[in-house]
Regions:
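Cytosolic, long alpha-helical scaffolding segments
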Residues: 2-243
Length: 243
């Protein structure tokens, strides 16, 4: 059977190199997980919210970094997005996941506290999606060309302002959970109107100018725009729970 599977799927590479999946260095013992809250449950939840806020901030920053790399066609900058993801985002996701799983499964918490942790876990999953969208954008930096790469704040498709607004939406959506202030959630949903306007304008411009000579480039740019729009949609999904 092993021989047959080897023929079907190819032999496993014989190498001692560390797989990419295991390059981050983490010590879960440092997470201070216990069967009872360390201090009060309030203090524990506030610490969890702080970690979630930090993770959200890192995801926002990497999204903007990836957009900047793609609009400037800067492969080195795009590579730094992957380095940042590995150094900070993957570690942050790992810790928040451990904390939310342990707290909800092993600490015999009350209904309201469990609800707060459930929301934290939901946001974590959305931040994971956002982090991957940022890397997908960075992947395309080598394959797209914009007209005015020297301008830090503008491009011909409004992608840079879309990215800035989306990052702010992510921040506000997570802050709505952390602070319990529904105003942040409502503001996130309102900001989506501006994203939709920029998106519609960009798509219309691309479709009106595409030809066989520029279709590869415009496909890449449209893909990035779709990724940013998807990121804004995710932020609205988070915010809708806290209005």
């Amino acid at each position: 059977m092993a021989t047959l599977l080897g023929k079907l799927f190819g032999e496993a590479p014989k190498t001692s190199e560390t797989p990419q999946a295991f390059t981050i260095k983490i010590d879960p013992a440092k997470f201070a997980i216990a069967t009872k809250p360390q201090g009060t449950i309030y203090v524990q939840l506030e610490a969890l919210k702080q970690k979630l806020t930090k993770l959200s901030s890192n995801v926002e920053n990497n999204l903007m970094l990836s957009i900047r790399a793609s609009t400037k066609g800067n492969v080195e900058l795009a590579s730094s997005a992957f380095n940042f993801d590995e150094a900070y985002i993957r570690k942050g996701k790992f810790e928040v996941e451990y904390l939310t799983v342990a707290y909800s499964a092993f600490q015999n918490l009350g209904e309201e506290d469990l609800k707060a942790i459930k929301y934290a876990r939901m946001i974590l999953k959305d931040l994971e999606r956002l982090a991957q969208l940022a890397l997908n954008i960075a992947d395309k930096a080598e394959y797209v060309k914009f007209a005015n790469v020297q301008d830090l704040h503008k491009d011909e498709y409004g992608l840079k302002p879309m990215g800035d607004i989306t990052a702010e939406m992510i921040k506000k959506a997570v802050e709505a959970y952390v602070s319990g202030n529904s105003k942040h959630a409502s503001e996130t949903l309102v900001m989506m109107n501006e994203i939709q306007s920029l998106y519609d304008t960009a798509v219309a411009k691309i479709k009106s100018s595409v030809n066989d000579q520029n279709i590869i480039n415009l496909t890449g740019i449209l893909s990035i725009i779709e990724h940013v729009k998807a990121s804004a949609d995710i932020s609205c999904s988070i915010a809708s729970n806290f209005c």
